[in-house]
């Protein structure tokens, strides 16, 4: 008997959805940053084992949109809960249910498939706090399963996989067993660069950056030559991203190159520039060019 199913992970921004996905896959597939709303595009990630295949749709955190990109992110996350076989609602025990959580719960009540409540960061919170949070959420809605985990340390991840297998239906293998992600290499490379930029930049340059891959070529020796732009919205952001004497941009390139080489399993030469594109997050045509799907 072979089972297969589509799973979506939902939760407030910065709750650890990307970290959980990476822990399940044991791969660095989804951008991880300490800043909320860093996952911007639905990434279908595929986990194939001997007797099942799980297709994960990694979604942005649900939040009140402030621009076209924000509207897309919220719509994307909401639509991801439709036409799936299982929903994982990820929360942190150290935070009481806020407006965002209550908004998600109202949406989850309309879902016709099993919903798991997954408590992240249990290693960082006392058992009493975890138990209190469990009680609070259990009173808000009924969940098929409640699983405490530590995505960062991998605690109870195998248990979570076992329970997901239990609930998904019998079905075909949708993707080849060696395929782990349905996005192209350029998209992944851009996300890696963006993650490094978010980690290294100060709060003066929050989410108003994107990465545009201009060129990605592989020579006869197997080395990738990559060129790209880091897009920002304000002229004042440009020198911050570049840094004194180009130091910040150099660090972004160095750190990104290491992860890109691990991803492509090849030597990489990368060159980045910083370009100002005012209000790019409200530019629908540019958002489409940058890979944000279903923009209308």
From Swiss-Prot:
It is found in: Cytoplasm; Cell membrane. SUPFAM superfamilies: P-loop containing nucleoside triphosphate hydrolases, Prokaryotic type KH domain (KH-domain type II). Keywords: Cell membrane, Cytoplasm, GTP-binding, Membrane, Nucleotide-binding, Ribosome biogenesis, RNA-binding, rRNA-binding. Residues 149-151 are annotated as: G5. Residues 3-170 form the Era-type G domain. It is a peripheral membrane protein. GTP binds at residues 11-18, 58-62, 120-123. GO terms for biological process: ribosomal small subunit assembly. GO terms for cellular component: cytosol; plasma membrane. It comes from the Bacteria. InterPro entries: G_ERA_dom, GTP-bd, GTPase_Era-like, KH_dom-like_a/b, KH_dom_type_2, KH_sf_prok-type, P-loop_NTPase, Small_GTP-bd. One of its GO terms (molecular function) is GTPase activity. Residues 201-278 form the KH type-2 domain. Residues 120-123 are annotated as: G4. Residues 37-41 are annotated as: G2. Residues 11-18 are annotated as: G1. Residues 58-61 are annotated as: G3. Pfam families: KH_2 (PF07650), MMR_HSR1 (PF01926). An essential GTPase that binds both GDP and GTP, with rapid nucleotide exchange. Plays a role in 16S rRNA processing and 30S ribosomal subunit biogenesis and possibly also in cell cycle regulation and energy metabolism. Belongs to the TRAFAC class TrmE-Era-EngA-EngB-Septin-like GTPase superfamily. Era GTPase family. Monomer. This is GTPase Era. It comes from Clostridium botulinum (strain Hall / ATCC 3502 / NCTC 13319 / Type A). The gene is era.
């Amino acid at each position: 008997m072979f089972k297969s199913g589509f799973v979506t992970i939902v939760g407030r921004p910065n709750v650890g959805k990307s970290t959980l996905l990476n822990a399940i896959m044991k791969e660095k597939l989804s951008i991880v940053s300490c800043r909320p709303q860093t996952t911007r595009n639905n990434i279908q990630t595929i986990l194939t084992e001997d007797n099942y295949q799980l297709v994960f749709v990694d979604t942005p955190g649900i939040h009140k949109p402030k621009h076209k990109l924000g509207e897309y992110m919220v719509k994307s996350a909401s639509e991801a809960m439709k036409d799936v076989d299982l929903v994982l609602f990820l929360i942190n025990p150290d935070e009481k249910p806020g407006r965002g959580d209550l908004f998600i719960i109202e949406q989850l009540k309309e879902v016709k498939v099993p919903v798991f409540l997954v408590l992240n960061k249990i290693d960082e919170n006392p058992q009493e706090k975890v138990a209190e949070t469990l009680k609070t959420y259990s009173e808000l809605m009924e969940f098929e399963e409640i699983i405490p985990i530590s995505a960062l340390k991998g605690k109870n991840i195998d248990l979570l996989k076992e329970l997901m297998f239990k609930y998904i239906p019998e079905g075909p293998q949708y993707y080849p067993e060696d395929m782990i992600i349905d996005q192209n290499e350029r998209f992944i490379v851009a996300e890696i660069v963006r993650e490094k930029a978010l980690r290294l930049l100060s709060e003066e340059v929050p989410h108003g950056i994107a990465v545009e891959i201009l060129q990605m070529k592989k020579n006869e020796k197997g080395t990738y030559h990559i060129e790209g732009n880091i897009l920002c919205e304000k002229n004042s952001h440009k020198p911050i991203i570049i840094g004194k004497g180009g130091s910040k941009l150099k660090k972004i390139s160095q750190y990104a190159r290491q992860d890109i080489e691990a991803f492509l399993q090849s030597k990489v030469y990368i060159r980045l520039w910083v370009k100002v594109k005012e209000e790019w997050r409200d530019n629908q045509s540019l958002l489409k060019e940058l890979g944000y799907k279903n923009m209308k």
